Amino acid sequence: MLPTLFSPAHLDACFAADYAGAHARFRHACDRHEHSGYREFVYRQTGPDKEKLVTATAWLGNKNASRVLVLQSATHGVEGFCGSAIQVDCLDYFIESKLPDDLAILFIHALNPHGFAWLRRVNEDGIDLNRNFVDFNQPLPVNEGYRTLAKDILPESESEFAAASERLKLKQQEMGRVAYEKAMSGGQYEFADGLFYGGQSASQSRLYLEEIFHAYQLHKRKKIAVLDFHTGLGPFGYGEAICDHPPGSAGVKWAKRVYGDSVTEPALGSSSSVPKLGLVDYFWQESLG
């Protein structure tokens, strides 16, 4: 029992007011571990106060562990406040508690530091990183539904906003909630100034994630669990375990065995999310097999 770690004061201290503060807290938490192997992957852009932007990693536990838990934050930039706090809390917890010999934790802090620093969901190129994991050597997916909504999502002038909003409401009624949400937020690769844009090539964050995957030799581990922290969907204050593995797959079965029946599946309609294109989940699925 570690009451000091789970006190409101401790949990509040895990949360930062901005990206720079979150990075500093994460670095400090890593420095308290003698062998965390803290690393930085630096971006060419800077934050609003000219601060350096980095995706940082740390490793707790046996370097040769066959089982690895990956904790990833700020895929959607501004959502990183929650994920970063969880990572800091976890690092603090294992100051006093020891991991099993064959289990390690890989922390990936601020996968999208630009969005985190500038309070944006997207990255430095206006890309939704969680739609960027498609095969850019193949023809890109076409979101026909988004095409029908695009002009009203981004009207040409402010005077058209009210009428556009009404048309979108009518579209939602016509299409139904799920079809509308898939069209709106499922991901698109055609309108660079639109919402949920997945880009035309691999982002810097994606390239760094691929580098991290190989640097830590994750392909050689026997079991990998990945928790990518997001906020904004579902009931306030409730943590939904969303699994985007194909229905009935070994990944879904394993997730439910580990995390229980609270695991939801967008493909089956049991989640607050809908099926989407180019998720970072698909990178992990493809890389781990």
Residues covered by each model-derived region:
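Structured catalytic-domain cores with a bias toward divalent-metal coordination
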Residues: 1-289
